[in-house]
A protein has these predicted regions:
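A recurrent flexible, glycine/aromatic-enriched loop bordering the glycosyltransferase active site
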Residues: 74, 95-119, 134-136, 142, ...
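Conserved nucleotide-sugar donor-binding
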Residues: 35-36, 114-127
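Acidic donor-binding segment of Leloir-type glycosyltransferases
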Residues: 1-21
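Conserved donor NDP-sugar-binding/catalytic core segment of glycosyltransferases
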Residues: 50-83, 87
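Short aromatic/hydrophobic "clamp" motif used to bind/position activated sugar donors
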Residues: 39
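Catalytic donor/gating beta->alpha subdomain of glycosyltransferases that bind UDP-sugars
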Residues: 126, 134-195
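Membrane-embedded multi-pass helical conduit in multi-pass membrane proteins
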Residues: 206-280
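Glycine-rich, basic loop-to-helix element that forms the pyrophosphate-binding segment
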Residues: 18-34, 55, 104, 108
């Protein structure tokens, strides 16, 4: 779905220019043009495993399955700073209940998948398209939430694999994290998207805890407890950074620093998104979203 017309020497491909709109609107245009029963979404900075579609489509043999997909892992050729970003997202204390989006885990039903690796029944997508595509990022959360009503299934299969190039640490990675935090704060205020909503408020609490710790170290009676809490957190992120860096073949110091900054930036973004109660309004106006 390019912005402008594109000519390809392949008669099997149907290219539909969408105009300068965000990815959520591009998906809606594609769904309205095609007559296929199943829509497959992937990002332009991702590429699929050769068996991606076969491993995902097989789940739709069950009529109760409405959405299927798998992880978007870090490509082996990414730069060291990109691999550090992938390791940060692979950390259990960063992505928590959404970790399956970034690493291969066991097959199971989940409450949400990332739109960079997501297949959905076309009728289910179109039924709620206007509601879910109002937001970006975050439209994949609403899509899965709406699609999985009335006992429908969202299936995660590690064999339905795509490779997703990461944003290099620290600038590009943290800008992405800020955007994620903003939409999560907005959703926490306006919408209940899953039973895991409380987990997403933890980084915001972490930011507020920084303020409390700074206040505590100025008080002799609380100074010991403040140092103990800071030491426990440092040990936790150190352990997690080493595990993630080893698994993703990334620089542990970049991962350690990145986990800490990701917690701060995501938490601050969550607070701002919740306080403003809006979802990137300037960008929506710019793109007609």
């Amino acid at each position: 779905m390019p912005d402008d017309p594109l000519v390809l020497d392949n008669e099997r491909l149907h290219v539909v220019p969408s105009g300068p709109v965000l990815p959520n609107r591009k998906r809606q245009v594609a769904a309205e043009v095609t007559t296929a029963e199943i829509l497959a979404f992937i990002d332009d900075d991702a590429y699929p495993d050769p068996d991606w579609l076969a491993n995902a489509v097989r789940h739709f043999a069950d009529p109760n399955v409405v959405v299927a997909g798998g992880p978007a892992v870090t490509p082996p050729g990414d730069s060291p700073r990109q691999r550090a970003s992938g390791a940060i997202f692979a950390s259990e204390i960063v992505t928590a209940t959404t970790r399956h989006r970034y690493v291969a885990e066991r097959q199971r039903d989940v409450y949400g998948l990332a739109s960079c690796n997501l297949l959905v029944r076309r009728d289910a997508f179109l039924r709620d398209a206007e509601a879910s595509v109002r937001y970006w990022p975050g439209e994949d959360i609403l899509l899965c939430m709406f699609a999985a009503r009335d006992g429908a299934r969202v299936v995660y299969d590690p064999a339905a694999l795509v490779y997703h190039h990461r944003r290099a640490v620290f600038g590009a990675h943290l800008r992405q994290v800020w955007s994620y935090g903003r939409f999560r704060g907005f959703f926490l205020r306006r919408l209940s998207t899953s039973q895991h909503d409380g987990v997403y408020a933890i980084p915001a609490a972490f930011v507020l805890a920084h303020v409390a710790l700074l206040a505590a170290v100025t008080r002799p009676r609380l100074r010991g407890a403040a140092y103990l809490a800071a030491g426990a957190y440092a040990a936790l992120i150190g352990w997690s950074a080493l595990r993630a860096a080893r698994a993703e073949r990334a620089n542990p110091w970049l991962v350690l620093t990145g986990i800490y900054l990701t917690h701060l930036v995501y938490g601050a973004g969550t607070i701002v998104g919740w306080l403003r109660g809006d979802h990137s309004p300037a960008e929506r106006r710019k793109h007609g979203n």
